[in-house]
Amino acid sequence: MKCRVWSEARVYTNINKQRTEEYWDYENTVIDWSTNTKDYEIENKVGRGKYSEVFQGVKLDSKVKIVIKMLKPVKKKKIKREIKILTDLSNEKVPPTTLPFQKDQYYTNQKEDVLKFIRPYIFDQPHNGHANIIHLFDIIKDPISKTPALVFEYVDNVDFRILYPKLTDLEIRFYMFELLKALDYCHSMGIMHRDVKPHNVMIDHKNKKLRLIDWGLAEFYHVNMEYNVRVASRFFKGPELLVDYRMYDYSLDLWSFGTMLASMIFKREPFFHGTSNTDQLVKIVKVLGTSDFEKYLLKYEITLPREFYDMDQYIRKPWHRFINDGNKHLSGNDEIIDLIDNLLRYDHQERLTAKEAMGHPWFAPIREQIEK
């Protein structure tokens, strides 16, 4: 669908316009692949996805644990994009931490001398990016099979299905604040993640460490550009993707974040459980209501696909309807309800930004810890 009503991000709108082309032009980037595959040893397989297989391994000379993501045959452009984004996120020098509710920009440093010839930092070099973004260590290609692989830091992750139900109220606030810091950082770098979900948030609970991983669907944000809506996993897709509105922005990540948060707070996994993309939108409308949905469609002049023509009318469901004896220790306060309500909005322009969310009263205990 061709967008009839244009929309642009409320924050970090022209970041990539202010950069040199080398920063975001991944199609013309030259990748300097290493062929030193003997530096690493694969120990066991830990996961697989549509575009890759993931293994745990070790760097032989230092015995440092690593993760090796072996890429399946895909378009070279997609591989270049992921590597360019990861190296951009790793190479930027992050200023000293400032509190998110201050008026100054959380991250303001700009770097214009990005090299077109990409080689990520290796183990003995300092990492300049944000701590909560997974660290890319190396890019290698087997000299015989030509299979490309990305080498990342290892995170002693606890599966979210096991971890999330055990987290205390304060721990949920802490980890979600850490995730917002990662999102605000990548957005400030002109990058949308486009696949925020529990599976892509690694948490080392013992060391209270969080990493946002899997940047294979991430993309640089440019004003007035229309993007592919076949991104994000079904349960975390924003309404804009489900109605084929292509001029979306960073706020897509905040919808996904909001669904994660609602799932953790209400102990309902996933929060919107559609059986197809069509049903996913119906599940959202059943909660947020038909009235606001129709206002959203009208504002952006969106015509629904034919399969939605016979959609029933639904009254908006109050958030307190999701509170029960099993979750009221997490959900039973107005602040968390207000935060979720301001994230899960049809209209992407109305959603809180990552920085705004960090300044929400629900995160006050976390901000107070930072001040100390």
UniProtKB/Swiss-Prot annotation:
The keyword Heme does not apply. SMART domains: S_TKc. The active site is at 195 (proton acceptor). It catalyses: L-seryl-[protein] + ATP = O-phospho-L-seryl-[protein] + ADP + H(+); L-threonyl-[protein] + ATP = O-phospho-L-threonyl-[protein] + ADP + H(+). ATP binds at residues 46-54, 69. PROSITE patterns: PROTEIN_KINASE_ATP, PROTEIN_KINASE_DOM, PROTEIN_KINASE_ST. One of its GO terms (cellular component) is UTP-C complex. It is an enzyme of class 2 (transferase). Keywords: ATP-binding, Kinase, Nucleotide-binding, Serine/threonine-protein kinase, Transferase. Residues 40-363 form the Protein kinase domain. GO terms for molecular function: ATP binding; protein kinase activity; protein serine kinase activity; protein serine/threonine kinase activity. Its EC number is 2.7.11.1. GO terms for biological process: DNA damage response; donor selection; maturation of SSU-rRNA; nucleolar large rRNA transcription by RNA polymerase I; regulation of cell cycle; regulation of ribosomal protein gene transcription by RNA polymerase II; regulation of transcription by RNA polymerase I; regulation of transcription by RNA polymerase III. Present with 7180 molecules/cell in log phase SD medium. Belongs to the protein kinase superfamily. Ser/Thr protein kinase family. CK2 subfamily. Catalytic subunit of a constitutively active serine/threonine-protein kinase complex that phosphorylates a large number of substrates containing acidic residues C-terminal to the phosphorylated serine or threonine. Phosphorylates YTA7 during S-phase to promote transcription of histones. Tetramer composed of an alpha chain, an alpha', one beta chain and one beta' chain. Interacts with FACT subunits POB3 and SPT16. Interacts with YTA7. This is Casein kinase II subunit alpha. It comes from Saccharomyces cerevisiae (strain ATCC 204508 / S288c) (Baker's yeast). The gene is CKA1.
